[in-house]
Amino acid sequence: MNRFNGLCKVCSERRYRQITIRRGKDGFGFTICCDSPVRVQAVDSGGPAERAGLQQLDTVLQLNERPVEHWKCVELAHEIRSCPSEIILLVWRVVPQIKPGPDGGVLRRASCKSTHDLLSPPNKREKNCTHGAPTRPEQRHSCHLVCDSSDGLLLGGWERYTEVGKRSGQHTLPALSRATTPTDPNYIILAPLNPGSQLLRPVYQEDAIPEEPGTTTKGKSYTGLGKKSRLMKTVQTMKGHSNYQDCSALRPHIPHSSYGTYVTLAPKVLVFPVFVQPLDLCNPARTLLLSEELLLYEGRNKTSQVTLFAYSDLLLFTKEEEPGRCDVLRNPLYLQSVKLQEGSSEDLKFCVLYLAEKAECLFTLEAHSQEQKKRVCWCLSENIAKQQQLAATPTERKMFETEADEKEMPLVEGKGPGAEERTPSKDPSPSQELPPGQELPPSKDPSPSQELPPGQELPPSKDPSPSQELPPGQELPSSKNPSPSQELPAGQDLPPRKESFSGQEAAPGPESPSSEDIATCQNPPQSPETSTSKDSPPGQGSSPTTEVPSCQGLPAGQESTSQDPLLSQEPPAIPESSASDQNVLPSQESPPSQGSLSEKALAEQTISPGELPAATAGEPSASRPNFVIPEVRLDSAYSQQDGAHGGSSGEDEDAEEGEEGEEGEEDEEDDTNDDNYGDRNEAKRSSLIETGQGAEGGLSLRVQNSLRRRTHSEGSLLQEARGPCFASDTTLHCSDGEGTTSTWAIPSPRTLKKELGRNGGSMHHLSLFFTGHRKMSGTDLADDVEASRKRKSKNIAKDMKNKLAIFRRRNESPGAQPAGKADKTTKSFKPTSEEALKWSESLEKLLLHKYGLEVFQAFLRTEFSEENLEFWLACEDFKKVKSQSKMAAKAKKIFAEFIAIQACKEVNLDSYTREHTKENLQSITRGCFDLAQKRIFGLMEKDSYPRFLRSDLYLDLINQKKMSPPL
């Protein structure tokens, strides 16, 4: 075995053990923990693993000659379970070193230096550890196993740990009592030698230990805490933390516990019963913090000894039936949903509150000492606050998740000729404001919506873009929005959504770009090498298509204010009608906050026809953006000359608005008619647009048919209800398509609710919705209109009755007769005032009277507690059933409707009554609901019945006067 990791034969035989374990009747007899590598957590005493020689803390390197050093614990456990007869393990073992102690006894020290030694492979350990300066004696924590030299036996068979020179400023709770021995009073009895039994391990607060000022690493040369910390960690060491002890900056990530000097973090076997779902205790995000033995109060005077496992996110209540073997008593309590009540400082009791079945329950626990109570309460309160804080933050993180992802996306460097290679720089966020006087660094570019105050200087950029107007050092004008065309060099592309709008709208400042820039934008070159801008350096190509719209989005008002003679020649201008329809171009008077570019830029850009294909042809393939910006194109049938004149003059705009105002009344009248809405084909109310192929090969503007919706004015909704013939959403969608016939489909819920409200909710109109109707046209349509008018005149009274039906009180109990029939039957036995006075004697007399039962049920309905009386009546009917089969079915129905948790008509019963009734259903008799019926009857008698006697409903019956007989 000397071939492993270059060790000699003697060392490899001492460190590596090949163990063959045969399967017993209860498995292989050991448990594992941790990930990469997997370690032995515990070995059952007398089991197959212990007989084969496996020991606790052995690191598993191979399974059946397969390397498993980098496997997870769950994967290795599944592989071990699948082995039918035996397994062959190659393990790495911690070998103790024995040398004489100071008092003549035998002192055993482990040869492993730290937790890093246990986790890292043996051949890499010497390279990863860096020798630091030796620690001072007052900083050392020694850990010895001492034999008494007088009798040659271990004192009680226990290991002893000592702590020398603890820092005075360290905040820790009182430690366990020290053992009184004549030899050395500093030794503390903690852990037994038997690896299968419980180990009590000291866990120190490592963050509070000072370091040498010149050292930056903590290596294995430390003779103090670093050397002995392998026995001071829980066996569930977090994955990936093996290298953290080599760097002081990462030391706070080392898992540790600060809830006391000594805590019981022993590896124990947890047995999960069938009714408890097993947990992933090897999860690196779940750390065992405390393991304490406490008293759990099961009644007022009945207590039981339990072991509380406090993890970083949950609590486990277990009972240790055997040493090192804990049975889980109940489902785990997650810390984010529990509360802690510590009680008085003198009392050793404290409570853990949790929610179960919509009720607040609690566990009453009692510690054995004040120190234990302080330690446990400190741990629970701190981690409950952490978990509740983490549970409140995920929604906020999701809100900014997309923004954070976009900020991390680097800019793609351009590959065009003359573009300089440099690392992508992060741009400021679009909505970020810079204080006055602050200058941007040269490596960063301002985002388009970034607000720069007046007088702020723009530093020179490394690669000036072709459309930059300001020379280095020139101050910006008083406008708050800088020109978005100054953002990126020509060789770079834009990342999605963050700066895709950088050049799509011109700045609303008073200056207008020069004629050369406009000529460059309106006549883009066919290739990057043929033509360059005046401002661009030689050898650098023109900007890609993301910069082409920067000059196309100029408002018309800026062209007229410019004094450049070349601008008066009016090159092919942008038709203003496309911009006026959408109202998207920012004016000079609009504030920057209202004209934000971040959300509207993709849908608000306007491009004249024929410009984008040329720009696309001139775009280099290497600098093509990763996304496609949707373009808005005018239809081919639109007159470009009219659009050009309308875009250059403001009078035509006013005339156009006047025409729209004159047509507004006609449109509003047309909107009120649903029958001919599907025949119209205007794109006025489209919420989104889509591109389509025009008649001459160009792109055309078209409305998405699926987004068309009916829109009515408020006056049309208040008009008289129309007939049932109306077009649904699906009908409108089909009517837009060419060559398709409209078919009926189920309308939208909003339309269904609106039409049912208009027509009174009658069954005739309801049947028309779900059975369909035929498309009417011509003479059939006229006949149907005439017939519907006659039908309306006949059914006015019926419709009004249906509309006012919601104001009538209806009998909502299942199986009851309709409200109208109930009113007629109850009027026949309406009591006199003397009979009503007898109802106040007892609740039984009230329920025995038919009219009294109806009145009391109506009163309970006003208090939203009629389910109590319905349950009582159901139990009375259940007692009258004679057939055993019907009795069983009715009993299950009553339990599911009234008693089961979260039932539709759940009554207010305590848990004992609910469980007692559930047990009675195993053998159904007539009295299985007696206890629950008595509880509900008592509840009505003490609560609802006195309020009924004081209600106006009952007082009116008592004080009623003799009415004259009806005519």
Curated annotation (Swiss-Prot):
Residues 677-687, 821-830 have a biased composition (Basic and acidic residues). Residues 650-676 have a biased composition (Acidic residues). Phosphorylated by cyclic GMP-dependent protein kinase. Residues 115-135, 389-705, 807-830 are annotated as: Disordered. GO terms for biological process: negative regulation of signal transduction. The modification Omega-N-methylarginine is found at R167. The modification Phosphoserine is found at S713, S716, S748, S777. It is a peripheral membrane protein. Residues 842-967 form the RGS domain. Keywords: Cytoplasm, Membrane, Methylation, Nucleus, Phosphoprotein, Signal transduction inhibitor, Ubl conjugation. Residues 476-486, 512-549, 577-597 have a biased composition (Polar residues). Detected in kidney, uterus, ovary, heart, brain, spleen, lung and testis. It is found in: Cytoplasm; Membrane; Nucleus. GO terms for cellular component: cytoplasm; nucleus; plasma membrane. Residues 18-95 form the PDZ domain. Down-regulates signaling from heterotrimeric G-proteins by increasing the GTPase activity of the alpha subunits, thereby driving them into their inactive GDP-bound form. Down-regulates G-protein-mediated release of inositol phosphates and activation of MAP kinases. Binds EFNB1 and EFNB2. Binds the GNB1-GNG2 heterodimer. Binds ESR1. This is Regulator of G-protein signaling 3.
